[in-house]
Amino acid sequence: MAGPPALPPPETAAAATTAAAAASSSAASPHYQEWILDTIDSLRSRKARPDLERICRMVRRRHGPEPERTRAELEKLIQQRAVLRVSYKGSISYRNAARVQPPRRGATPPAPPRAPRGGPAAAAAPPPTPAPPPPPAPVAAAAAPARAPRAAAAAAAATAPPSPGPAQPGPRAQRAAPLAAPPPAPAAPPAAAPPAGPRRAPPPAAAVAARESPLPPPPQPPAPPQQQQQPPPPPPPQQPQPPPEGGAARAGGPARPVSLREVVRYLGGSSGAGGRLTRGRVQGLLEEEAAARGRLERTRLGALALPRGDRPGRAPPAASARAARNKRAGEERVLEKEEEEEEEEDDEDDDDDVVSEGSEVPESDRPAGAQHHQLNGGERGPQTAKERAKEWSLCGPHPGQEEGRGPAAGSGTRQVFSMAALSKEGGSASSTTGPDSPSPVPLPPGKPALPGADGTPFGCPAGRKEKPADPVEWTVMDVVEYFTEAGFPEQATAFQEQEIDGKSLLLMQRTDVLTGLSIRLGPALKIYEHHIKVLQQGHFEDDDPEGFLG
């Protein structure tokens, strides 16, 4: 369009540069502007820092002007904000302002480099009257009504040189080509550009209104967290529908996130009784419900685990949870999925919350179903590793070893279930569910308790084969049982998660225990100094290392 007329008359451009230099020192010559901007862009594309010396040298080599003139024109471009001066690590370089859009505030100031480019029609109007400079300024200002006054002033200054009216859009149009913007089109994008920051896609006519009132849109994104914390009026009509058909809702149709208050309402708890709803309280209610239905069993620390029959002996917890979920459907599947996920994430964090929940609900309400399931030993499959660990940890101390030791590991205040509810084998140990049943499980006459490496007894439940005397032959569960009896039940689960058997235990270094198991420093030091180190010394003094390592 306006590009071809700019090239033929070179004397017009020369007259324009002299007139610009004489009349207004603040406006840079379009040829110089194009040369300097192209030089900066080419230097940046070659990853060379466009400092003053490089720019002057390259402009002189390509086009011939002296460095002093290039320096003066560069200063004018900096005043027009077409070039930015950047100081980085003590050295000053220059950047093309049209390429630097993100740092500008609110996405409005990219208008200055675009202003003359977006208004070729406005610049084409003044050729009949080239002499007076005032007419182009109001035309340019009218072409960009929604821009900042500084941008309008820069556009007016850029269109101020009188004679090259048609010649001005030429270099701008040529420079617009590498920027991938056709000359006639960009009249609309600058108007739509400012609202792109705060708004998604408003109509161009509402650009000014969008800039004046940016406050109403932002409160919409944080609405879901508020919906989870305090009950707004809309959810109650939707609330009764998801829980009864939880499985169907997950099978087909989009899943809607369930708030904590809806879960509490569905489980029958009083939502506003205890003040603010926390995740721990809701998890406690979920555990009550699952334990009452007999779907989950409560362990000694108050956490819930799948029944023994639903979990293979050595399968990882994720696989056992998946197998259990495949067996169930409907709301029990939803409850158990939530329970498994929350138990894996927050087992240790929410331990105190679970115990407090257990103290709120009477003890007689919960163990009835759980004891019934636990005492029917015939219904269950093989005993899992985790349950065996909990079972061993709850056995009473051996009568011969009772003196000189502190309270047993299972005698802490966190024990929620009674001892009678945790005697797992159906006919092996005779224990009643009454309140005065003896807590230590009696040993069968043919199996005396053998002291371990540190003097702790093993032989607690009937029918279980004893732990080998040599630590090399210990399985993962023997290691877990050893540390549980030694008074470190929480740390024993870390050994179980890492699947550390006797051989690995004897090879552990001090740093492995302190940093590799994700357990606290105090218990880790005690475990290493008083147990692992003692076992290693005893083993390597008794046995030869070749036989162990082989």
UniProtKB/Swiss-Prot annotation:
Where the record annotates domain SAMD1-like winged helix (WH), the positions are 24-100
Supply the InterPro entries for this chain.
SAM, SAM/pointed_sf, SAMD1-like_SHD, SAMD1-like_WH
| Localization per record | Nucleus; Chromosome; Secreted
Where does the record place Basic and acidic residues bias? 290-300
GO MF terms listed in the record are: chromatin binding; DNA binding; low-density lipoprotein particle binding
Cite the residue spans of the region called Disordered: 1-32, 93-468
Which residue ranges have biased composition labelled Acidic residues? 337-355
Q: Which residues carry this modification: Phosphothreonine?
A: T108
Any one of the GO BP annotations: foam cell differentiation
Modified residues annotated as Phosphoserine in this record: S163, S270
**Which terms in the GO cellular component ontology are assigned?**
chromosome; extracellular space; nucleus
Which residues fall in a compositionally biased region of kind Low complexity?
12-30, 139-160, 170-179, 246-257
Which keywords annotate this record? Chromatin regulator, Chromosome, Nucleus, Phosphoprotein, Secreted
* Main localization of the protein described in the UniProt heading: nucleus
Composition bias type Pro residues, residue spans: 1-11, 125-138, 180-205, 214-245, 437-448
- Per the database record, which ranges form the SAM domain? 474-542
PANTHER family on file: STERILE ALPHA MOTIF DOMAIN-CONTAINING PROTEIN 1, UPF0575 PROTEIN C19ORF67
Q: Know anything about its domains from the record?
A: Winged-helix (WH) domain directly recognizes and binds unmethylated CpG-containing DNA via simultaneous interactions with both the major and the minor groove of DNA.
> How does the record describe its quaternary structure?
Homopolymerize into a closed pentameric ring. Interacts (via SAM domain) with L3MBTL3 (via SAM domain); the interaction mediates L3MBTL3 binding to chromatin. Interacts (via WH domain) with KDM1A; the interaction modulates KDM1A function.
Q: Sum up the protein's function in the record's words.
A: Unmethylated CpG islands (CGIs)-binding protein which localizes to H3K4me3-decorated CGIs, where it acts as a transcriptional repressor. Tethers L3MBTL3 to chromatin and interacts with the KDM1A histone demethylase complex to modulate H3K4me2 and H3K4me3 levels at CGIs. Plays a role in atherogenesis by binding with LDL on cell surface and promoting LDL oxidation which leads to the formation of foam cell.
Please give the name of this protein.
Answer: Atherin
- Provide the species name: Oryctolagus cuniculus
